[in-house]
Amino acid sequence: MDFPPKVVASVTSKDDAKEAIALGADVVEVRVDLVGGDGPGLVESIYYDIGCPIIVTIRPKFEGGEFDGTDAERVQLFKKLTPYADFADFELRAKNLDELLTTITGTDAVPIVSYHDFDRTPSNEEMLSIINRSVEKGAIGKLAVMPKDMTDVLRLLEITLKSKRPVCTISMGSLGQHSRLVAPVYGSLLTYGYVRRPVAPGQIRVDQLLEGLRILGLR
């Protein structure tokens, strides 16, 4: 799996999705867990009316999201939405990960298997293990971690370069904010930005991300 780094805009409304594409985003991530209303309707509306590539994310509370339904309810939601998705994001720590992965069967959706640590940056060995376990599921491995110092950010970039796997890596918060621009230099396939307000710590506005990638020769 190899393609130029894509700029992803995390959105919770159709207007956000329209603005994201106008700003130059390659993909919109619909945070169904943050929509607070008709999430499935929003995904379908973006699919039919805007026609841009979509990542469907239904992030549960145990991974920093807002979805608090049952595992079975989340599986059914994914089954309903993956036909409209280009990517579907599932958590490595989900107890029913294998069942979640079956929801893309028969669709064109590419799985993203993600791992978020909002407290620390694991050891290099742990991060490589997380990436490998994610990629072994046939997925892009997404690893988002919180740095305590700049050395943590550098370690994440080192792992990104060394992994030689299809990955998306993010060092979160203000300390790691620049990783959203430079991680693609080291091999990260996706970088996430926002349109109106950040949905994750350290996100950069989509148009600013694009300008940074142009300066770095990645656009």
UniProtKB/Swiss-Prot annotation:
Where does the record place the catalytic residues? 116 (proton donor/acceptor), 142 (schiff-base intermediate with substrate)
- EC number(s) recorded for this UniProt protein: 4.2.1.10
Q: Which SUPFAM superfamilies does UniProt cross-reference here?
A: Aldolase (SSF51569)
Check the record and name the NCBIfam families matching this protein: aroD (TIGR01093)
Supply the InterPro entries for this chain.
Answer: Aldolase_TIM, DHquinase_I, Type-I_3-dehydroquinase
Q: What UniProt keywords are attached to this protein's entry?
A: Amino-acid biosynthesis, Aromatic amino acid biosynthesis, Lyase, Schiff base
Single GO biological process annotation from the record:
3,4-dihydroxybenzoate biosynthetic process
Q: Which reaction does it catalyse?
A: 3-dehydroquinate = 3-dehydroshikimate + H2O
Q: What is the top-level taxon of the source organism?
A: Archaea
An example molecular function term from Gene Ontology annotations: 3-dehydroquinate dehydratase activity
Which named protein is this?
3-dehydroquinate dehydratase
Q: Which organism is it from?
A: Methanocella arvoryzae (strain DSM 22066 / NBRC 105507 / MRE50)
Q: Which family does it belong to?
A: Belongs to the type-I 3-dehydroquinase family.
The pathway entry for this protein reads as: Metabolic intermediate biosynthesis; chorismate biosynthesis; chorismate from D-erythrose 4-phosphate and phosphoenolpyruvate: step 3/7
* Record function comment: Involved in the third step of the chorismate pathway, which leads to the biosynthesis of aromatic amino acids. Catalyzes the cis-dehydration of 3-dehydroquinate (DHQ) and introduces the first double bond of the aromatic ring to yield 3-dehydroshikimate.
Record: residues binding 3-dehydroquinate: 10, 29-31, 59, 180, 203
